[in-house]
Curated annotation (Swiss-Prot):
One of its GO terms (molecular function) is DNA-binding transcription factor activity, RNA polymerase II-specific. One of its GO terms (cellular component) is nucleus. The lineage of its organism: Eukaryota, Metazoa, Chordata, Craniata, Vertebrata. One of its GO terms (biological process) is mitotic cell cycle. This is Transcriptional activator Myb. Residues 315-449 are annotated as: Negative regulatory domain. It comes from the Eukaryota. Residues 32-83, 84-139, 140-190 form the HTH myb-type domain. The gene is myb.
Length: 624
Protein backbone atom coordinates (compact mmCIF):
# COMPACT_ATOMS: atom_id res chain seq x y z
CA UNK A 1 0.00 0.00 0.00
CA UNK A 2 1.48 3.30 -1.11
CA UNK A 3 1.96 5.98 1.46
CA UNK A 4 1.88 9.71 0.84
CA UNK A 5 5.28 11.39 1.29
CA UNK A 6 5.84 13.35 4.41
CA UNK A 7 5.30 16.86 3.21
CA UNK A 8 4.60 19.52 5.79
CA UNK A 9 5.35 22.54 3.69
CA UNK A 10 5.59 25.96 5.20
CA UNK A 11 3.22 27.31 2.56
CA UNK A 12 0.49 24.72 2.92
CA UNK A 13 -3.03 25.64 3.94
CA UNK A 14 -3.80 23.93 7.19
CA UNK A 15 -7.54 24.18 6.58
CA UNK A 16 -7.32 21.49 3.92
CA UNK A 17 -6.84 18.84 6.62
CA UNK A 18 -9.50 19.05 9.29
CA UNK A 19 -8.43 18.01 12.76
CA UNK A 20 -10.68 17.20 15.70
CA UNK A 21 -9.79 17.53 19.33
CA UNK A 22 -11.02 14.42 21.10
CA UNK A 23 -14.56 14.65 19.66
CA UNK A 24 -14.74 10.89 19.31
CA UNK A 25 -18.53 10.65 19.39
CA UNK A 26 -19.21 13.57 17.07
CA UNK A 27 -20.26 13.51 13.44
CA UNK A 28 -18.20 14.58 10.49
CA UNK A 29 -19.12 17.96 9.10
CA UNK A 30 -21.18 17.95 5.93
CA UNK A 31 -20.07 19.40 2.66
CA UNK A 32 -16.38 18.34 2.91
CA UNK A 33 -14.55 15.63 1.06
CA UNK A 34 -13.20 12.85 3.28
CA UNK A 35 -10.78 10.61 1.39
CA UNK A 36 -11.19 7.48 3.44
CA UNK A 37 -10.82 9.47 6.65
CA UNK A 38 -12.71 8.74 9.83
CA UNK A 39 -12.54 10.33 13.23
CA UNK A 40 -9.76 9.34 15.50
CA UNK A 41 -10.81 6.97 18.23
CA UNK A 42 -9.48 6.83 21.77
CA UNK A 43 -7.61 3.61 20.99
CA UNK A 44 -5.89 5.25 18.00
CA UNK A 45 -4.87 8.30 20.05
CA UNK A 46 -3.42 6.13 22.82
CA UNK A 47 -1.58 3.99 20.30
CA UNK A 48 -0.22 7.10 18.53
CA UNK A 49 1.12 8.49 21.80
CA UNK A 50 2.97 5.25 22.56
CA UNK A 51 4.42 5.08 19.03
CA UNK A 52 5.67 8.69 19.27
CA UNK A 53 7.35 7.89 22.59
CA UNK A 54 9.05 4.88 21.03
CA UNK A 55 10.03 6.30 17.60
CA UNK A 56 10.16 10.06 18.15
CA UNK A 57 8.61 12.85 16.07
CA UNK A 58 10.54 12.22 12.84
CA UNK A 59 9.63 8.68 11.76
CA UNK A 60 6.02 9.23 10.72
CA UNK A 61 6.05 6.56 8.04
CA UNK A 62 7.07 3.95 10.57
CA UNK A 63 4.40 5.17 12.98
CA UNK A 64 1.74 5.13 10.24
CA UNK A 65 2.56 1.51 9.43
CA UNK A 66 1.19 0.49 12.83
CA UNK A 67 -2.06 2.40 12.30
CA UNK A 68 -4.33 0.96 9.60
CA UNK A 69 -6.05 3.45 7.27
CA UNK A 70 -3.85 6.32 8.54
CA UNK A 71 -1.20 8.12 6.52
CA UNK A 72 2.01 9.62 7.81
CA UNK A 73 0.64 13.14 7.26
CA UNK A 74 -2.48 12.35 9.26
CA UNK A 75 -0.42 10.96 12.13
CA UNK A 76 1.90 13.97 12.05
CA UNK A 77 -0.96 16.49 12.08
CA UNK A 78 -2.81 14.61 14.77
CA UNK A 79 0.21 14.76 17.01
CA UNK A 80 1.26 18.32 16.33
CA UNK A 81 -2.20 19.88 16.47
CA UNK A 82 -4.03 17.80 19.05
CA UNK A 83 -2.04 15.33 21.08
CA UNK A 84 1.22 17.16 21.67
CA UNK A 85 1.32 18.00 25.40
CA UNK A 86 3.46 21.07 24.71
CA UNK A 87 0.69 22.81 22.76
CA UNK A 88 -0.55 26.10 24.17
CA UNK A 89 -4.23 26.73 23.52
CA UNK A 90 -4.70 29.70 25.80
CA UNK A 91 -4.77 33.42 25.00
CA UNK A 92 -1.86 35.13 23.32
CA UNK A 93 0.52 37.26 25.35
CA UNK A 94 2.05 40.58 24.32
CA UNK A 95 5.44 38.95 23.95
CA UNK A 96 4.02 36.34 21.58
CA UNK A 97 2.25 38.98 19.49
CA UNK A 98 5.42 41.02 19.21
CA UNK A 99 7.36 37.91 18.24
CA UNK A 100 4.84 37.04 15.52
CA UNK A 101 5.10 40.56 14.06
CA UNK A 102 8.88 40.33 13.94
CA UNK A 103 8.85 36.87 12.34
CA UNK A 104 6.31 37.90 9.71
CA UNK A 105 8.50 40.85 8.74
CA UNK A 106 11.43 38.45 8.51
CA UNK A 107 9.89 35.41 6.75
CA UNK A 108 6.78 36.86 5.15
CA UNK A 109 3.05 36.23 5.80
CA UNK A 110 3.03 32.68 4.35
CA UNK A 111 5.75 30.60 5.99
CA UNK A 112 3.75 29.83 9.10
CA UNK A 113 5.39 26.49 9.89
CA UNK A 114 8.79 28.16 10.06
CA UNK A 115 7.36 30.95 12.19
CA UNK A 116 5.73 28.41 14.53
CA UNK A 117 9.10 26.79 15.24
CA UNK A 118 10.20 29.99 16.96
CA UNK A 119 7.12 30.03 19.19
CA UNK A 120 7.08 27.19 21.68
CA UNK A 121 3.67 25.62 22.01
CA UNK A 122 2.21 27.30 18.92
CA UNK A 123 1.49 25.77 15.55
CA UNK A 124 1.44 27.39 12.13
CA UNK A 125 -2.32 27.60 11.97
CA UNK A 126 -2.50 29.49 15.25
CA UNK A 127 0.13 31.96 14.10
CA UNK A 128 -1.61 32.53 10.79
CA UNK A 129 -5.00 33.17 12.36
CA UNK A 130 -3.47 35.45 14.98
CA UNK A 131 -1.78 37.53 12.31
CA UNK A 132 -4.73 37.90 9.96
CA UNK A 133 -7.40 38.42 12.60
CA UNK A 134 -5.58 40.69 15.05
CA UNK A 135 -2.05 41.77 14.13
CA UNK A 136 -2.10 42.57 10.41
CA UNK A 137 -2.29 46.38 10.06
CA UNK A 138 -3.66 46.10 6.52
CA UNK A 139 -6.74 44.17 7.58
CA UNK A 140 -9.80 46.35 8.10
CA UNK A 141 -11.43 46.10 11.48
CA UNK A 142 -14.16 48.68 10.84
CA UNK A 143 -17.82 47.91 10.29
CA UNK A 144 -18.94 46.53 6.98
CA UNK A 145 -20.14 49.04 4.41
CA UNK A 146 -22.93 48.82 1.90
CA UNK A 147 -20.56 48.51 -1.05
CA UNK A 148 -18.75 45.59 0.60
CA UNK A 149 -22.02 43.84 1.34
CA UNK A 150 -23.17 44.29 -2.24
CA UNK A 151 -19.86 42.94 -3.55
CA UNK A 152 -20.09 39.90 -1.30
CA UNK A 153 -23.70 39.33 -2.32
CA UNK A 154 -22.97 39.45 -6.05
CA UNK A 155 -19.79 37.35 -5.73
CA UNK A 156 -21.48 34.73 -3.61
CA UNK A 157 -24.16 34.26 -6.26
CA UNK A 158 -21.41 33.49 -8.80
CA UNK A 159 -18.75 31.72 -6.72
CA UNK A 160 -20.62 30.21 -3.81
CA UNK A 161 -18.56 29.56 -0.67
CA UNK A 162 -15.18 30.15 -2.32
CA UNK A 163 -14.15 32.71 0.25
CA UNK A 164 -10.54 32.98 -0.91
CA UNK A 165 -11.71 34.07 -4.36
CA UNK A 166 -14.22 36.49 -2.86
CA UNK A 167 -11.52 37.95 -0.59
CA UNK A 168 -9.53 38.99 -3.68
CA UNK A 169 -12.39 41.35 -4.57
CA UNK A 170 -12.29 43.06 -1.17
CA UNK A 171 -8.88 44.48 -0.29
CA UNK A 172 -8.34 44.61 3.44
CA UNK A 173 -10.78 41.78 4.20
CA UNK A 174 -9.67 38.21 4.84
CA UNK A 175 -11.48 35.14 3.67
CA UNK A 176 -12.16 34.14 7.25
CA UNK A 177 -13.67 37.53 8.08
CA UNK A 178 -15.85 37.43 4.96
CA UNK A 179 -17.04 33.93 5.81
CA UNK A 180 -17.92 34.92 9.37
CA UNK A 181 -19.74 38.05 8.20
CA UNK A 182 -21.78 36.10 5.68
CA UNK A 183 -22.75 33.30 8.07
CA UNK A 184 -23.53 35.54 11.03
CA UNK A 185 -25.31 38.48 9.40
CA UNK A 186 -25.77 38.58 5.66
CA UNK A 187 -27.19 35.11 5.01
CA UNK A 188 -29.94 35.53 7.60
CA UNK A 189 -30.90 38.97 6.30
CA UNK A 190 -30.75 37.80 2.69
CA UNK A 191 -32.96 34.76 3.31
CA UNK A 192 -35.47 36.24 5.75
CA UNK A 193 -35.64 39.93 4.86
CA UNK A 194 -34.59 40.02 1.20
CA UNK A 195 -31.54 42.14 2.02
CA UNK A 196 -29.86 43.72 -1.05
CA UNK A 197 -32.09 41.82 -3.47
CA UNK A 198 -33.76 45.03 -4.66
CA UNK A 199 -30.57 47.06 -4.78
CA UNK A 200 -30.44 47.06 -8.57
CA UNK A 201 -33.98 48.41 -8.79
CA UNK A 202 -33.10 51.11 -6.32
CA UNK A 203 -30.16 52.25 -8.42
CA UNK A 204 -32.32 52.47 -11.54
CA UNK A 205 -34.85 54.82 -9.96
CA UNK A 206 -32.35 57.08 -8.22
CA UNK A 207 -33.21 60.76 -8.74
CA UNK A 208 -30.30 63.10 -9.32
CA UNK A 209 -30.30 65.96 -6.85
CA UNK A 210 -27.97 68.75 -5.92
CA UNK A 211 -26.68 66.80 -2.93
CA UNK A 212 -24.13 64.07 -3.64
CA UNK A 213 -24.10 63.06 0.04
CA UNK A 214 -26.77 62.57 2.66
CA UNK A 215 -25.04 64.78 5.18
CA UNK A 216 -26.24 68.20 4.00
CA UNK A 217 -28.18 70.35 6.40
CA UNK A 218 -30.24 73.43 5.71
CA UNK A 219 -30.43 76.39 8.05
CA UNK A 220 -32.89 79.24 8.16
CA UNK A 221 -32.66 82.92 8.95
CA UNK A 222 -35.62 84.09 10.96
CA UNK A 223 -36.32 87.74 10.08
CA UNK A 224 -39.24 90.09 10.57
CA UNK A 225 -41.25 91.17 7.55
CA UNK A 226 -40.58 94.67 6.32
CA UNK A 227 -41.00 96.77 3.25
CA UNK A 228 -37.84 95.27 1.77
CA UNK A 229 -38.99 91.68 2.10
CA UNK A 230 -39.52 91.45 -1.66
CA UNK A 231 -35.81 92.07 -2.22
CA UNK A 232 -34.68 89.08 -0.15
CA UNK A 233 -32.77 86.40 -1.97
CA UNK A 234 -32.33 82.68 -1.60
CA UNK A 235 -29.05 83.29 0.21
CA UNK A 236 -31.09 83.05 3.40
CA UNK A 237 -30.84 79.28 2.98
CA UNK A 238 -27.13 78.49 3.35
CA UNK A 239 -26.00 74.89 3.12
CA UNK A 240 -23.50 73.34 5.48
CA UNK A 241 -21.56 70.22 4.63
CA UNK A 242 -20.66 67.76 7.36
CA UNK A 243 -17.80 65.36 6.92
CA UNK A 244 -18.55 61.65 6.60
CA UNK A 245 -17.19 60.83 10.03
CA UNK A 246 -19.43 63.44 11.64
CA UNK A 247 -23.08 62.78 12.33
CA UNK A 248 -25.54 65.08 14.03
CA UNK A 249 -27.36 63.02 16.61
CA UNK A 250 -31.09 63.25 17.07
CA UNK A 251 -31.00 65.36 20.28
CA UNK A 252 -28.56 67.80 18.67
CA UNK A 253 -30.67 68.07 15.55
CA UNK A 254 -33.73 68.72 17.66
CA UNK A 255 -31.98 71.35 19.78
CA UNK A 256 -30.71 73.42 16.84
CA UNK A 257 -33.85 72.88 14.71
CA UNK A 258 -32.08 70.89 12.01
CA UNK A 259 -34.07 69.00 9.41
CA UNK A 260 -32.20 66.32 7.47
CA UNK A 261 -32.81 66.50 3.74
CA UNK A 262 -33.52 62.96 2.47
CA UNK A 263 -30.94 61.25 0.27
CA UNK A 264 -32.62 58.93 -2.18
CA UNK A 265 -29.81 56.56 -3.12
CA UNK A 266 -29.24 54.93 0.27
CA UNK A 267 -32.77 54.00 1.23
CA UNK A 268 -32.87 50.27 2.06
CA UNK A 269 -29.47 49.77 3.67
CA UNK A 270 -28.73 52.50 6.20
CA UNK A 271 -30.97 51.10 8.90
CA UNK A 272 -28.81 47.96 8.86
CA UNK A 273 -25.75 49.94 9.97
CA UNK A 274 -27.29 52.58 12.21
CA UNK A 275 -28.59 50.25 14.85
CA UNK A 276 -28.69 46.52 15.52
CA UNK A 277 -31.90 46.71 17.47
CA UNK A 278 -34.04 43.63 16.59
CA UNK A 279 -37.25 45.58 17.24
CA UNK A 280 -36.34 48.38 14.86
CA UNK A 281 -38.11 46.82 11.88
CA UNK A 282 -41.41 46.78 13.76
CA UNK A 283 -40.98 50.38 14.86
CA UNK A 284 -40.14 51.44 11.31
CA UNK A 285 -43.38 49.91 10.04
CA UNK A 286 -45.34 51.67 12.76
CA UNK A 287 -43.68 54.95 11.85
CA UNK A 288 -44.52 54.37 8.20
CA UNK A 289 -48.20 53.97 9.05
CA UNK A 290 -48.11 57.03 11.26
CA UNK A 291 -46.33 58.98 8.53
CA UNK A 292 -48.96 58.03 5.97
CA UNK A 293 -51.81 59.11 8.23
CA UNK A 294 -50.05 62.38 9.07
CA UNK A 295 -49.40 63.09 5.41
CA UNK A 296 -53.05 62.51 4.53
CA UNK A 297 -54.13 64.80 7.35
CA UNK A 298 -51.72 67.52 6.22
CA UNK A 299 -52.98 67.21 2.63
CA UNK A 300 -56.55 67.76 3.75
CA UNK A 301 -55.53 70.75 5.83
CA UNK A 302 -53.61 72.12 2.86
CA UNK A 303 -56.80 71.96 0.78
CA UNK A 304 -58.59 73.95 3.47
CA UNK A 305 -55.79 76.50 3.49
CA UNK A 306 -56.11 77.00 -0.26
CA UNK A 307 -59.69 78.21 0.21
CA UNK A 308 -59.08 80.55 3.14
CA UNK A 309 -59.08 84.32 2.74
CA UNK A 310 -56.03 86.55 2.80
CA UNK A 311 -54.10 86.49 6.04
CA UNK A 312 -54.23 89.58 8.25
CA UNK A 313 -51.60 89.69 10.96
CA UNK A 314 -50.30 92.22 13.42
CA UNK A 315 -46.65 91.64 12.40
CA UNK A 316 -46.22 89.76 9.14
CA UNK A 317 -43.26 87.40 9.10
CA UNK A 318 -41.66 85.51 6.26
CA UNK A 319 -39.72 82.29 6.49
CA UNK A 320 -36.05 82.77 5.80
CA UNK A 321 -36.59 85.92 3.74
CA UNK A 322 -37.92 83.95 0.80
CA UNK A 323 -39.15 86.41 -1.89
CA UNK A 324 -41.79 83.95 -3.08
CA UNK A 325 -44.33 84.83 -0.47
CA UNK A 326 -47.66 83.76 -1.93
CA UNK A 327 -48.39 80.52 -3.70
CA UNK A 328 -44.88 79.11 -3.48
CA UNK A 329 -42.90 77.07 -1.02
CA UNK A 330 -39.34 76.12 -0.15
CA UNK A 331 -36.78 76.14 -3.01
CA UNK A 332 -37.32 73.16 -5.24
CA UNK A 333 -33.65 72.17 -5.19
CA UNK A 334 -33.91 71.13 -1.54
CA UNK A 335 -36.37 68.39 -2.31
CA UNK A 336 -35.10 67.28 -5.65
CA UNK A 337 -38.34 67.98 -7.54
CA UNK A 338 -38.17 71.23 -9.54
CA UNK A 339 -41.62 70.82 -11.09
CA UNK A 340 -43.94 70.64 -8.11
CA UNK A 341 -44.47 73.18 -5.43
CA UNK A 342 -47.01 73.58 -2.66
CA UNK A 343 -48.24 76.94 -1.39
CA UNK A 344 -47.05 77.81 2.08
CA UNK A 345 -48.92 80.57 3.92
CA UNK A 346 -47.35 83.26 5.99
CA UNK A 347 -46.93 82.63 9.66
CA UNK A 348 -47.53 85.11 12.43
CA UNK A 349 -44.83 84.34 14.99
CA UNK A 350 -45.79 87.22 17.24
CA UNK A 351 -48.69 85.17 18.57
CA UNK A 352 -46.53 82.12 19.35
CA UNK A 353 -43.73 81.41 21.81
CA UNK A 354 -40.24 81.95 20.55
CA UNK A 355 -39.39 78.26 20.49
CA UNK A 356 -42.53 77.14 18.71
CA UNK A 357 -42.12 79.85 16.05
CA UNK A 358 -38.99 78.27 14.63
CA UNK A 359 -39.16 78.26 10.81
CA UNK A 360 -37.17 75.05 10.64
CA UNK A 361 -39.95 73.16 12.35
CA UNK A 362 -42.51 74.59 9.96
CA UNK A 363 -40.26 73.61 7.09
CA UNK A 364 -40.30 70.07 8.44
CA UNK A 365 -44.08 70.05 8.08
CA UNK A 366 -43.82 71.24 4.49
CA UNK A 367 -41.17 68.57 3.95
CA UNK A 368 -43.75 65.87 4.63
CA UNK A 369 -46.06 67.47 2.06
CA UNK A 370 -43.32 67.51 -0.56
CA UNK A 371 -42.57 63.82 0.00
CA UNK A 372 -45.62 62.79 -2.04
CA UNK A 373 -43.93 64.19 -5.18
CA UNK A 374 -40.79 62.10 -4.81
CA UNK A 375 -40.52 58.88 -6.76
CA UNK A 376 -38.40 57.23 -4.10
CA UNK A 377 -36.83 58.47 -0.87
CA UNK A 378 -34.64 57.35 1.94
CA UNK A 379 -36.69 55.56 4.58
CA UNK A 380 -34.26 56.12 7.42
CA UNK A 381 -33.67 59.82 6.81
CA UNK A 382 -37.39 60.46 6.29
CA UNK A 383 -38.08 58.84 9.65
CA UNK A 384 -35.41 61.04 11.26
CA UNK A 385 -37.01 64.12 9.70
CA UNK A 386 -40.42 62.95 10.85
CA UNK A 387 -39.19 62.45 14.41
CA UNK A 388 -37.76 65.97 14.45
CA UNK A 389 -40.93 67.65 13.24
CA UNK A 390 -44.07 65.58 13.73
CA UNK A 391 -44.28 65.85 17.51
CA UNK A 392 -43.70 69.60 17.56
CA UNK A 393 -46.12 70.12 14.66
CA UNK A 394 -48.87 68.26 16.50
CA UNK A 395 -48.25 70.31 19.63
CA UNK A 396 -48.40 73.54 17.63
CA UNK A 397 -51.54 72.35 15.94
CA UNK A 398 -53.23 71.67 19.27
CA UNK A 399 -52.06 74.71 21.20
CA UNK A 400 -51.45 77.37 18.56
CA UNK A 401 -53.61 77.16 15.49
CA UNK A 402 -51.98 80.07 13.77
CA UNK A 403 -49.98 77.66 11.62
CA UNK A 404 -53.06 75.97 10.20
CA UNK A 405 -55.65 78.75 10.23
CA UNK A 406 -56.00 82.51 10.47
CA UNK A 407 -53.30 83.88 12.81
CA UNK A 408 -54.48 85.53 16.02
CA UNK A 409 -52.69 88.46 17.59
CA UNK A 410 -52.04 88.81 21.28
CA UNK A 411 -54.98 91.19 21.65
CA UNK A 412 -57.33 88.86 19.76
CA UNK A 413 -56.74 85.60 21.65
CA UNK A 414 -60.11 85.80 23.40
CA UNK A 415 -62.09 86.25 20.17
CA UNK A 416 -61.96 83.06 18.14
CA UNK A 417 -63.36 83.29 14.65
CA UNK A 418 -65.80 80.88 13.11
CA UNK A 419 -63.21 79.58 10.66
CA UNK A 420 -60.92 78.54 13.51
CA UNK A 421 -63.72 76.67 15.25
CA UNK A 422 -64.69 74.94 12.03
CA UNK A 423 -61.10 73.88 11.36
CA UNK A 424 -60.68 72.68 14.92
CA UNK A 425 -63.89 70.66 14.73
CA UNK A 426 -62.81 69.01 11.49
CA UNK A 427 -59.49 68.07 13.04
CA UNK A 428 -61.12 66.56 16.11
CA UNK A 429 -63.60 64.56 14.06
CA UNK A 430 -60.90 62.98 11.92
CA UNK A 431 -59.57 59.86 13.62
CA UNK A 432 -56.81 57.57 12.47
CA UNK A 433 -58.41 54.12 12.35
CA UNK A 434 -55.04 52.40 12.04
CA UNK A 435 -53.22 53.61 15.13
CA UNK A 436 -55.79 55.34 17.35
CA UNK A 437 -59.05 54.33 18.92
CA UNK A 438 -61.96 56.53 17.76
CA UNK A 439 -62.92 59.06 20.40
CA UNK A 440 -66.32 58.76 22.10
CA UNK A 441 -68.42 61.88 21.94
CA UNK A 442 -69.35 62.58 25.54
CA UNK A 443 -71.82 65.24 24.50
CA UNK A 444 -74.09 62.56 23.04
CA UNK A 445 -73.86 60.43 26.16
CA UNK A 446 -74.66 63.33 28.46
CA UNK A 447 -77.41 64.90 26.34
CA UNK A 448 -80.27 63.16 28.20
CA UNK A 449 -80.42 62.58 31.97
CA UNK A 450 -80.45 59.07 33.30
CA UNK A 451 -83.76 58.18 34.96
CA UNK A 452 -83.25 56.76 38.47
CA UNK A 453 -84.81 53.42 39.22
CA UNK A 454 -87.85 53.13 41.55
CA UNK A 455 -85.67 51.30 44.02
CA UNK A 456 -83.42 54.35 44.34
CA UNK A 457 -86.49 56.57 44.79
CA UNK A 458 -87.81 54.34 47.57
CA UNK A 459 -84.47 54.33 49.36
CA UNK A 460 -84.21 58.10 49.06
CA UNK A 461 -87.70 58.57 50.52
CA UNK A 462 -86.94 56.15 53.35
CA UNK A 463 -83.68 57.91 54.24
CA UNK A 464 -85.37 61.31 54.07
CA UNK A 465 -88.16 60.21 56.40
CA UNK A 466 -86.37 57.96 58.89
CA UNK A 467 -82.72 58.83 58.44
CA UNK A 468 -79.92 56.75 56.89
CA UNK A 469 -80.19 52.98 57.09
CA UNK A 470 -77.83 51.10 59.39
CA UNK A 471 -76.61 47.57 58.78
CA UNK A 472 -76.19 45.64 62.05
CA UNK A 473 -75.10 42.08 62.74
CA UNK A 474 -78.03 39.74 63.38
CA UNK A 475 -77.11 38.44 66.82
CA UNK A 476 -79.57 37.75 69.67
CA UNK A 477 -77.93 40.37 71.86
CA UNK A 478 -78.24 43.10 69.25
CA UNK A 479 -81.84 42.15 68.47
CA UNK A 480 -82.86 42.35 72.13
CA UNK A 481 -81.19 45.73 72.52
CA UNK A 482 -82.84 47.04 69.37
CA UNK A 483 -86.29 45.91 70.50
CA UNK A 484 -85.88 47.52 73.90
CA UNK A 485 -84.67 50.74 72.31
CA UNK A 486 -87.64 50.87 69.93
CA UNK A 487 -90.14 50.16 72.74
CA UNK A 488 -88.58 52.84 74.93
CA UNK A 489 -88.58 55.40 72.13
CA UNK A 490 -92.20 54.82 71.18
CA UNK A 491 -93.23 54.76 74.82
CA UNK A 492 -91.70 58.19 75.38
CA UNK A 493 -93.38 59.59 72.30
CA UNK A 494 -96.88 58.28 73.07
CA UNK A 495 -96.81 58.95 76.82
CA UNK A 496 -97.04 55.33 77.94
CA UNK A 497 -97.10 54.77 81.69
CA UNK A 498 -94.51 52.17 82.61
CA UNK A 499 -94.43 52.26 86.39
CA UNK A 500 -94.71 48.52 86.68
CA UNK A 501 -91.74 47.93 84.38
CA UNK A 502 -89.30 49.06 87.07
CA UNK A 503 -90.63 46.87 89.87
CA UNK A 504 -91.46 43.67 88.08
CA UNK A 505 -89.71 41.41 85.63
CA UNK A 506 -89.54 42.84 82.08
CA UNK A 507 -92.37 41.74 79.89
CA UNK A 508 -90.08 40.90 76.95
CA UNK A 509 -87.97 38.53 79.05
CA UNK A 510 -91.00 36.70 80.39
CA UNK A 511 -92.49 36.38 76.94
CA UNK A 512 -89.22 34.89 75.67
CA UNK A 513 -89.21 32.34 78.49
CA UNK A 514 -92.80 31.39 77.78
CA UNK A 515 -92.03 30.90 74.10
CA UNK A 516 -88.98 28.71 74.77
CA UNK A 517 -90.81 26.62 77.42
CA UNK A 518 -92.41 23.48 75.88
CA UNK A 519 -95.18 23.41 78.52
CA UNK A 520 -96.33 26.87 77.58
CA UNK A 521 -96.42 25.88 73.92
CA UNK A 522 -98.91 23.12 74.76
CA UNK A 523 -100.93 25.49 76.90
CA UNK A 524 -100.92 28.10 74.23
CA UNK A 525 -102.44 25.66 71.80
CA UNK A 526 -105.29 25.03 74.23
CA UNK A 527 -105.95 28.69 74.90
CA UNK A 528 -105.64 29.41 71.21
CA UNK A 529 -108.59 27.18 70.44
CA UNK A 530 -110.54 28.71 73.32
CA UNK A 531 -110.06 32.29 72.16
CA UNK A 532 -110.82 31.40 68.59
CA UNK A 533 -114.17 30.13 69.76
CA UNK A 534 -114.88 33.30 71.73
CA UNK A 535 -114.14 35.73 68.87
CA UNK A 536 -117.02 35.09 66.53
CA UNK A 537 -116.41 36.87 63.30
CA UNK A 538 -113.35 38.97 64.21
CA UNK A 539 -110.76 39.24 61.48
CA UNK A 540 -107.37 39.52 63.13
CA UNK A 541 -105.01 39.13 60.16
CA UNK A 542 -104.89 40.37 56.62
CA UNK A 543 -105.84 37.85 53.96
CA UNK A 544 -102.49 36.57 52.71
CA UNK A 545 -101.14 33.42 51.16
CA UNK A 546 -100.88 30.61 53.70
CA UNK A 547 -97.72 29.36 52.05
CA UNK A 548 -95.76 32.44 53.08
CA UNK A 549 -96.59 32.29 56.80
CA UNK A 550 -96.97 28.55 57.41
CA UNK A 551 -93.86 28.27 59.56
CA UNK A 552 -94.94 31.09 61.86
CA UNK A 553 -98.69 30.54 62.16
CA UNK A 554 -98.51 28.33 65.26
CA UNK A 555 -96.17 30.67 67.09
CA UNK A 556 -98.12 33.82 66.33
CA UNK A 557 -101.47 32.29 67.22
CA UNK A 558 -100.12 30.89 70.49
CA UNK A 559 -98.64 34.21 71.51
CA UNK A 560 -101.49 36.44 70.52
CA UNK A 561 -104.40 34.28 71.73
CA UNK A 562 -102.99 33.61 75.19
CA UNK A 563 -105.26 34.93 78.01
CA UNK A 564 -103.96 37.99 79.71
CA UNK A 565 -103.14 37.81 83.38
CA UNK A 566 -104.25 40.43 85.90
CA UNK A 567 -100.87 42.15 86.00
CA UNK A 568 -100.61 42.28 82.25
CA UNK A 569 -104.18 43.46 82.04
CA UNK A 570 -103.36 46.30 84.40
CA UNK A 571 -100.39 47.30 82.24
CA UNK A 572 -102.37 47.24 79.04
CA UNK A 573 -105.26 49.18 80.53
CA UNK A 574 -102.91 51.99 81.45
CA UNK A 575 -102.19 52.65 77.76
CA UNK A 576 -104.31 55.30 76.09
CA UNK A 577 -106.58 54.01 73.38
CA UNK A 578 -105.43 56.53 70.81
CA UNK A 579 -101.79 55.33 71.02
CA UNK A 580 -102.41 52.01 69.29
CA UNK A 581 -101.09 53.32 65.98
CA UNK A 582 -97.76 54.29 67.49
CA UNK A 583 -96.81 50.64 68.03
CA UNK A 584 -96.56 49.90 64.37
CA UNK A 585 -93.20 49.62 62.67
CA UNK A 586 -91.86 52.69 60.85
CA UNK A 587 -91.95 50.72 57.65
CA UNK A 588 -95.68 50.10 58.12
CA UNK A 589 -96.45 53.82 57.91
CA UNK A 590 -95.83 53.61 54.19
CA UNK A 591 -99.20 51.86 53.74
CA UNK A 592 -102.35 53.08 55.46
CA UNK A 593 -104.28 49.87 54.74
CA UNK A 594 -101.96 47.86 56.96
CA UNK A 595 -103.38 49.38 60.16
CA UNK A 596 -106.95 48.84 59.02
CA UNK A 597 -106.44 45.21 58.07
CA UNK A 598 -104.28 44.16 61.00
CA UNK A 599 -105.61 46.22 63.97
CA UNK A 600 -109.37 46.14 64.48
CA UNK A 601 -111.17 49.09 66.07
CA UNK A 602 -113.65 46.95 68.03
CA UNK A 603 -113.69 47.21 71.82
CA UNK A 604 -113.41 43.50 72.47
CA UNK A 605 -110.22 43.26 70.33
CA UNK A 606 -108.19 46.17 71.71
CA UNK A 607 -106.10 43.93 73.93
CA UNK A 608 -105.43 41.52 71.07
CA UNK A 609 -104.56 44.42 68.78
CA UNK A 610 -102.11 45.80 71.32
CA UNK A 611 -100.45 42.42 71.71
CA UNK A 612 -100.30 42.00 67.95
CA UNK A 613 -98.71 45.41 67.49
CA UNK A 614 -95.99 44.51 69.97
CA UNK A 615 -95.11 41.12 68.58
CA UNK A 616 -95.49 41.85 64.89
CA UNK A 617 -92.22 43.81 65.10
CA UNK A 618 -90.38 40.67 66.21
CA UNK A 619 -92.14 38.50 63.65
CA UNK A 620 -89.04 37.86 61.50
CA UNK A 621 -86.57 37.47 64.37
CA UNK A 622 -88.29 34.90 66.63
CA UNK A 623 -87.07 31.33 66.21
CA UNK A 624 -89.42 28.40 66.66
Amino acid sequence: MDRRPSQYSSEEEDDEIEMYEHDYDGLLSKGKRHLGKTRWTREEDEKLKKLVEQNGTEEWKVIASFLPNRTDVQCQHRWQKVLNPELIKGPWTKEEDQRVIELVHKYGPKRWSVIAKHLKGRIGKQCRERWHNHLNPEVKKSSWTEEEDRTIYEAHKRLGNRWAEIAKLLPGRTDNAIKNHWNSTMRRKEEQEGYLQNSSKTNQHTIVTNFPKSNHLMTFTHTRASAEHSQASTSSFPYYHIAEHQNASYPVALRVNIVNVPQLATAPVQRHYNDEDPEKEKRIKELELLLMSTENEINQKQELLNHTASYTTCHSTTIGGNPRLHGQSTPDSCLGDPHHSTPSPQVDHSCLPEESASPARYFGVNLLIQMKNLAEYSETQLIDSFLNTSTQHENLEMEHQSLTSTPICASQKNTITTSLLRDHALRLQKENHLLRTPAIKRSILNSTPRTPTPFKNALAAQEFKHGPLKLLHHTPLHLAEDIQEVIKQETDESGIVHDHCNTEEPLLKRIKQEVESPTHKVGNLYFSSYWEGESLNAQLFRQQSTLDDTSNSILTSSLLMKPVSEKEDHIFKSFPVQSIKSYTSPLQHLSGTWDVMSCSRMEDQKILAEQYCKYIKNFSTLVI
